[in-house]
């Protein structure tokens, strides 16, 4: 039996909470509006609503469906921004999962993360789409330097920013007792 819990808090740093999530059966999603831009809250709400509507209309949900749902939300947001100039620059991250038996399908864009907690170890599944992650991967900065780097909040991919969106996705085998964190 799977138990799902959702919680979103504003925290101590931000003045507004731009996080949104949904849980529907075996499907979960988290979006986080880009706080430095206009419309981050609108983008995250719109994206989570579009993703939910897309996925809950399907009979079964697999890895490609998760990618397609994010791409669908991206197109809807891009189209909305084209009609409402005041929303220019808005965007959001997205991480979406679906559990099918012992398989965890996932898709992500941005820096909202997916983790699997097993046997006392927390393992990050997704890779951030951020400038500091690219610098780390290139060996130009260390993990410690990521935390204070001036570009630590700069995303290299986000939902709703460009017409064409590359979505990362994968499949993880899960075991009884695993905890999935988005």
Feature locations, PLM:
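PP2C/PPM-type serine/threonine phosphatase catalytic domain
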Residues: 1-182
């Amino acid at each position: 039996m799977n138990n799902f819990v959702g919680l979103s808090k504003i925290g101590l740093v931000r003045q507004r909470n731009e996080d949104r999530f949904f849980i529907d059966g075996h499907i979960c999603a988290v979006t986080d509006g880009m706080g430095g831009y206009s419309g981050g809250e609108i983008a995250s709400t719109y994206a989570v609503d579009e993703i939910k509507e897309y996925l809950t209309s399907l009979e079964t949900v697999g890895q490609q469906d998760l990618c397609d749902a994010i791409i669908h939300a991206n197109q809807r947001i891009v189209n909305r921004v084209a009609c409402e100039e005041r929303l220019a620059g808005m965007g959001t991250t997205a991480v979406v999962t679906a559990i099918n038996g012992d398989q965890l399908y996932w898709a992500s864009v941005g820096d909202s993360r997916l983790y699997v907690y097993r046997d006392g170890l927390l393992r990050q599944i997704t890779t951030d789409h951020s400038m500091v992650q690219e610098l780390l991967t290139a060996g130009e900065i260390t993990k410690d330097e990521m935390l204070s780097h001036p570009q630590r909040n700069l995303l290299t991919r986000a939902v709703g920013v460009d017409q064409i969106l590359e979505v990362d996705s994968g499949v993880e085998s899960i075991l009884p007792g695993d905890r999935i964190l988005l």
